[in-house]
Amino acid sequence: MDGLKRYLSSAPILATIWFAITAGILIEFNRFFPDLLFHPL
């Protein structure tokens, strides 16, 4: 049970770091290849 509490207390921090890294990768990708993220249907 102690491990579950530790996981639940660290999950928001890990999610914030993960989303920040993902957003940074998408922003840099969009800076170098601005037309590849939005495909016309």
Curated annotation (Swiss-Prot):
The gene is psaJ. It holds the Pfam family PSI_PsaJ. Keywords: Membrane, Photosynthesis, Photosystem I, Thylakoid, Transmembrane, Transmembrane helix. GO terms for cellular component: photosystem I; plasma membrane-derived thylakoid membrane. It is a single-pass membrane protein. HAMAP family: PSI_PsaJ. This is Photosystem I reaction center subunit IX. It comes from Synechococcus elongatus (strain ATCC 33912 / PCC 7942 / FACHB-805). NCBIfam families: PRK02733.1 (NF002743). InterPro entries: PSI_PsaJ, PSI_PsaJ_sf.
